[in-house]
Amino acid sequence: MNELRGELSIELGKETHEVLLNLNAFRLLCRDKKMELTALDEFVNSDPLDFVPTVIYWGIMNAQDIKGQPRPEVNYNHMSAIICSDLEKFQELSEAVGQSMGSTGGKEGN
């Protein structure tokens, strides 16, 4: 896992998926949600329990796109249930999403 580059992995059942959080992942998310990039702040603040899984989902798709490989079939609701059922996992992924968006998570100067 290389969180500083927005690279991590997530286990969904018996499968492990690579996640790549970069501008393209956010572009894919915005295109899917039919929203402008500037609306991400509103999305994260209004519904963080959906925002984090949504970013992770598009990070999974982005990781495959950048390698030129077919996208995996990921059931969004199943993935969200796994992420939201484990507070530690949710916090870890939230921090990774925040870092990919340029948030320092209270770690200024480090």
Regions found by a protein language model. Name each.
Residues 51-62:
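Short, hydrophobic/amphipathic alpha-helical patches that form generic packing surfaces
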Residues 21-27:
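A short, sequence-level motif marking secondary-structure junctions
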Residues 27-33:
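Covalent nucleotidyltransferase core used to form phosphodiester bonds in nucleic acids
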Residues 1-11, 16, 34-46, 50, ...:
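Charged interaction scaffolds used for protein-protein
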